[in-house]
Amino acid sequence: MTEQKLNDENHWSEETSLDFINYGRYFIPEREYQMQVISGLLSTLKGENHILDLCCGEGFLDEVILDAYPSFTLQGLDGSMEMLHRAQEHLSRFGNRFTSTKFDLAANDWRHPEQTVNAVISSMAIHHLTGSQKQKLFTDVFKILAPDGILIIADIIAHPDKMGEQQAAEALDDVVRRRSIKLDGNTAAFEFFRKEGWNIFRYLDPEDIDKPSPLFNQLKWLEQSGFSNVDVHWMLAGHAIFSARKSEIP
């Protein structure tokens, strides 16, 4: 991501949030399918369950989940007030089944929830943490999850060599170009994506906000944190959906 997208502390800014609100539907590969995959993975939870969404954005994923599971409640956490306002408006029809809270993903205060958490989900957020921060996050999430709880992550992943990075960069360009044409009939969104340096695999800077980790490393960290049933459910253009459970479900 280009430098102007960050604030002075190299954090996600409200300007970045507005860009993502306007262009996120083009930039995320198979966005609609990803949401269905994540929602489907929650089907093993029966009865009333409480879900925690780390970096909920505008709440599109949460809408899919709340529609699919009428007995679920969901708390959306995000670092952007603009995102939280949008989510609260977008999900107002669910009443008190959806609540929102401003937070810092890397902080510890939110990791001591007052109510039982049956699932933690996160889309396009964990890559903002360093490797050690991801490991701590996985350990803390394992602790707060109820027995048989599940952690589901959809995120950007790093590649171990230049060949993998190049393939992911080209694939992501192709995905965004195709979505731009499919949704709008032109390549304007793709041109913005390219001009503003949103292809992380072409413009990744070690000092940038984006710190993706290899998928294999993250799967190992999940097991080391105590999770079982660690699995990968989807991959495309440097993006993946993977999950882990607090205990095995037959």
Predicted regions and their residues:
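Core SAM-dependent methyltransferase catalytic element
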Residues: S228-P250
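Class I SAM-dependent methyltransferase SAM/SAH-binding core
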Residues: L52, G59-N108
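A short glycine-rich, Lys/Arg-flanked "PGG" loop and its adjoining helix->strand segment in the class I
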Residues: Q135-P147
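Residues lining the SAM
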Residues: S122-I126, A154
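C-terminal alpha-helical "lid/dimerization" subdomain adjacent to the S-adenosyl-L-methionine
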Residues: I156-E223
